A protein has these predicted regions:
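Active-site histidine-anchored catalytic micro-motif
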Residues: 183
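Short conserved active-site loop signatures built around small residues
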Residues: 180
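Conserved "HGTGT" condensation-loop signature of ketosynthase/thiolase-family condensing enzymes
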Residues: 1-169
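Short loop-beta-helix segment that forms the pyridoxal 5′-phosphate
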Residues: 169-175
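Short beta->alpha junction loops/turns
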Residues: 121, 176-177
C-alpha cells in the first residue's frame, strides 16, 4: 500500500491561548520557557465531600484583560468554555494583524471564505451542571432559555464564528484529547 503524502500546508497566522500557566500567549510562552507548572492542589470542599481520588488539577489562569475582552452580555450568554474560546480567538485574530475586528471589516479577509474549526472534549459542562441544579431546586421554568446553546459542544465554534463574522463554516470536533489536533486538520 502506498503511503499518503500530505499536499496541504498549514499556515498559522495568529495565536491565542487561555491555559493553566497564562491567560494569554505571551504569559503562557514565558511561563513555559521558565518551566512553570500549572498544576495546583484543589482546595474546594467538594473534593472531600465526594471522596475524589484526585486532588490536583491544571486550572486555567485568569485570562489577560478578561473584562476588556468580553461584554457583560457575552459573559452571561456563554458557558465558561465559550468565554475562553472567544477570548483566545480574539487574541489570535489580533495577533494575526488583520486590519479590522472581524472578517467583514478586515480588508484582507473574505468572510465567505473564513471559517472556524474548533476542538473540544465536552463543551458547556458548567452550564449543564447549573441547569441540573436549577431544575432540581427551582423547577423547569427557572432553567435559563439559553441553556441548550450554552451547553452544546458546537456552541463554542458558533460563538467564535458569529463574533468574527466568519461565514464559511463553524465546525466542531469532539474526540476527547485529539479534538484540537483533528480540528486543525479541518481548518
Amino acid at each position: 500500500q502506498e503511503s499518503v503524502k500530505m499536499s496541504r500546508k498549514v499556515l498559522v497566522t495568529g495565536l491565542g491561548a487561555t491555559t493553566p500557566i497564562g491567560g494569554d500567549v505571551p504569559t503562557t510562552w514565558a511561563n513555559a520557557l521558565k518551566g512553570v507548572s500549572g498544576i495546583t492542589k484543589i482546595d474546594e470542599p467538594w473534593v472531600e465531600e465526594y471522596s475524589l481520588p484526585v486532588y490536583i488539577a491544571g486550572r486555567l489562569a485568569e485570562p489577560a484583560h478578561e473584562s476588556e475582552r468580553l461584554t457583560k452580555v457575552e459573559a452571561k450568554r456563554l458557558d465558561p468554555s465559550g468565554q475562553l474560546a472567544l477570548i483566545a480567538a480574539r487574541e489570535a485574530w489580533e495577533d494575526a494583524g488583520f486590519s479590522g475586528s472581524d472578517a467583514e471589516s478586515a480588508e484582507e479577509v473574505d468572510p465567505l471564505r473564513t471559517g472556524v474549526a474548533f476542538g473540544t472534549g465536552i463543551g458547556g459542562v458548567w452550564t449543564l451542571l447549573d441547569a441540573w441544579d436549577t431544575l432540581r431546586e427551582k423547577g423547569p421554568r427557572r432553567v435559563l432559555p439559553m441553556t441548550v446553546p450554552m451547553l452544546m459542544p458546537n456552541g463554542n465554534a458558533a460563538a467564535v464564528s458569529m463574533n468574527l463574522k466568519a461565514r464559511a463554516a463553524a465546525q466542531t470536533v469532539v474526540s476527547a484529547c485529539a479534538s484540537s489536533t483533528e480540528a486543525m486538520e479541518l481548518g
